[in-house]
Amino acid sequence: VAAGGFITLMKSIPTIVSAFKGGMASMGEKGAVALSRTENDLNFKVVIFGSIGLVALMAFLPQIPGTNIFYKLILGLLVIIFGFFFVTVSSRIVGLIGSSNNPISGMTIATIMATALVFISVGWTGHVYEPMALVVGGMICIAAANAGATSQDLKTGYIVGATPRYQQIALFIGVIV
């Protein structure tokens, strides 16, 4: 499962780079480029500020394990990094095959293993760090599941001619509720 995920990730790298470049370019544009209604996505600034907000929430929520804010900020950064890649894999697989083949468990295990490797490499060993690794894995599990559902929603919206921006706003409201 992990090997298939990494192969999918490698195949997705050109798409990831292209989308990231397009998002960064759209942030710097002064005049709005005329897009058709069905290509109007949520502003890339929302993604950036949402990611920063997630890291800030993780740093200050008392439910997140960690002895100080530094550890919690590292957890937030790991969630952003792993989420960036594993959400891409989840979305791609669900878009190509369907939601029944979303490899959430494999990506969660790979995330926990990678987080454990990061922790070991910086000397964070012991029982106090185990819940921290599980938090990162749990958040990636949730992100991958939401990515699959979002991918299905956007695919259906594309087929019926919906505006992606409004779908994305509705999905944000659903997450908050």
Show the residue positions of the predicted features:
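Alpha-helical multipass membrane-protein architecture
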Residues: 1-177
